[in-house]
Curated annotation (Swiss-Prot):
Sn-glycerol 1-phosphate binds at residues 169-175, 200-201, 222-223. Pfam families: PcrB. This is Geranylgeranylglyceryl phosphate synthase. Gene3D superfamilies: FMN-linked oxidoreductases. One of its GO terms (biological process) is glycerophospholipid biosynthetic process. It comes from Methanothermobacter marburgensis (strain ATCC BAA-927 / DSM 2133 / JCM 14651 / NBRC 100331 / OCM 82 / Marburg).
Amino acid sequence: MKVEDYFHDILGERKIHLTLIDPEEQTPEEAVEIAEAAIRGGTDGIMLGGSTTDSSELDATAGALRENIDVPIILFPGNTTGVSRHADAIFFMSLLNSNNPYWIIGAQALGAPAVKKMGIEALPMGYLVVEPGGTVGWVGDTKPVPRNKPDIAAAYAMAAEFLGMRLFYLEAGSGAPQHVPEEMISLVKRCTDQILIVGGGIRTGADAARVAGAGADIIVTGTVVENSSNVEDKIREIVEGMGSL
């Protein structure tokens, strides 16, 4: 089954949780342990990427995950090096509010031949950085959307949908002190038919409940996993929060 179909099947019944793992933060063996714990906690898939610039680390981690887990492995590339043949799909995304055309379409053009050659399912996605934006906002040379301007985010989402992007990701930034505002999530959801993904600043079940209740279809957590001494319990808390609507 294609990953996009997998998403739609789940969304017919409930919200989706994805766990983000950065290959640079641990060994492939440790990444497998984290993924297995997250799956026991209820996560629906593993996102792989982030700050990585070493394609060999990414490939080794993706390969180890492929041998040990059954949920989809989805690439979340930080640059053209973020591609591996072991993945099921890739968030093929454009950083819409970057000031640098490289992050809007340049990196995508450079990476597309590899994605095509490897036969990875490409999930067309608009990626929008919201204040404070974190590292991705700085590296991606963005103009983060102000938290009190949901209409700007909605305009970007509609433009992305008209350009054929079937997924849309609101990003507050890794380790952000607050998640994307509920008002912004709700307006974006009302204005488009895209699968809406929200990440950044989601640390607790209560956070997850607010974000899911506002309209997010998919919630992504990463930093909270890196900082948790019990990944399974933390993911279960977040997943249960999402289901408490």
